[in-house]
């Protein structure tokens, strides 16, 4: 009885492997066309975008700071001393009640 079960296991193992391989292959085959269709759709949308302007030259977003010499972003505002800022913002007028 044990020999017959062993032989049945040996005969059924390749069949089971073949079935599982065919199922997994079928799954990949069904998924592949959808992936290529969506990819081409993305590529077509990129072609419809307006072209990026190239005449801006070779400018960089970073420029040397005239005071320190270190590079900093070009669009950065000038730093104000905290004491000067406080002086500008505080209202020193005294109101009579």
From Swiss-Prot:
Keywords: Stress response
Keyword Nucleus assigned: no
Transmembrane regions listed in the UniProt entry: none
Source taxon at top rank: Eukaryota
Induction summary: By salt, drought and heat stress.
Pfam families linked to this entry: LEA_3a (PF03242)
Protein's recorded name: Late embryogenesis abundant protein Lea5
Organism, scientific name: Citrus sinensis (Sweet orange)
Underlying gene: LEA5
């Amino acid at each position: 009885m044990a020999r017959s079960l062993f032989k049945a296991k040996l005969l059924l193992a390749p069949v089971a492997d073949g079935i599982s391989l065919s199922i997994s292959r079928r799954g990949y085959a069904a998924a592949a066309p959808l992936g290529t269709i969506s990819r081409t759709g993305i590529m077509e949308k990129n072609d419809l975008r307006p072209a990026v302007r190239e005449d801006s030259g070779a400018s960089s977003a970073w420029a040397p700071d005239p005071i320190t010499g270190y590079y900093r972003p070009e669009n950065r505002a000038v730093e104000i001393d905290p004491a000067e800022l406080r002086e500008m913002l505080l209202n020193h007028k005294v109101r009579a009640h």
